Regions:
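Active-site histidine-anchored catalytic micro-motif
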Residues: 1-103, 108-121, 125-218
């Protein structure tokens, strides 16, 4: 596949002390020399894995970094159905961070909007307000009607392991799928890619749990 290399700048190209030209020239040099296929990000003299990078700062040139999250998923080659030449359809997705005080009515409003998948940002290793029976019931109902429910960790260096605490196990039993050590950006992009390719919920869940391009395996 043709490599995709993304770059940009923290200051406009015409501003004094801009990093735009250094990033652009550096990115072109990387392309000229050749690098691993796939999506990469070049910023501040660093070549970063596109499926692992996050923006951590808004006030410095080293704004992007790869987070060393635990990634232990089984790797699988990208199937033809998910190839970059395949057309994609629009997908209705949502992201919701869990927080103390989250009400079931908030979740109901989101699910009633017709989302096909919901990415929940859970506490730590994959816990949340699991003592809220109404909220859990809403998740179970959404899962039963075909909504793909996935969970990432809110921690910058975390991963979702539902079996560590009872609270996490209850979320898993309500239908949530662990994103393992994927970042929010990677998990969201993966959901867009899987569902946008026309895969059904069950098939999308199967591929979501596998590592396809280094997003969830070292």
């Amino acid at each position: 596949p043709i490599p995709v290399l993304l770059t940009g700048s923290m200051r406009p190209a015409g501003a004094t002390g801009s990093d735009a030209w250094d990033n652009l020239v550096g990115a072109l040099r990387v392309l000229q020399e050749g690098h691993a296929r796939g999506v990469q990000v070049y910023f501040n003299d660093a070549l970063l894995h596109g499926a692992r990078v996050s923006k951590l700062r808004s006030d410095a040139f080293d704004a992007f970094a790869e987070l060393p999250r635990p990634r232990h998923a089984e790797h699988a080659p990208v199937p033809a159905a998910l190839g970059y030449r395949q057309p994609r359809r629009e997908v209705n997705l949502a992201v919701l961070p869990l927080y103390p005080g989250l009400r079931a009515a908030h979740l109901r409003g989101l699910l009633d909007s017709g989302v096909e998948a919901l990415l929940l940002e859970c506490y730590g290793s994959g816990t949340g307000p699991s003592d809220d029976e109404e909220l859990l019931a809403l998740l179970r109902e959404a899962h039963a009607r075909g909504v793909l429910l996935a969970a990432v960790s809110q921690c910058a260096y975390g991963q979702v392991e539902f079996g560590v605490y009872a609270a996490g196990s209850r979320l898993r039993d309500a239908g949530l799928l662990s994103a393992g050590g994927m970042t929010r950006e990677a998990a969201l992009g993966k959901l867009f890619g899987l569902l946008g390719a026309g895969l059904g919920r069950d098939e999308a869940q199967r591929w979501f749990a596998l590592d396809l391009c280094g997003e969830n395996a070292d």
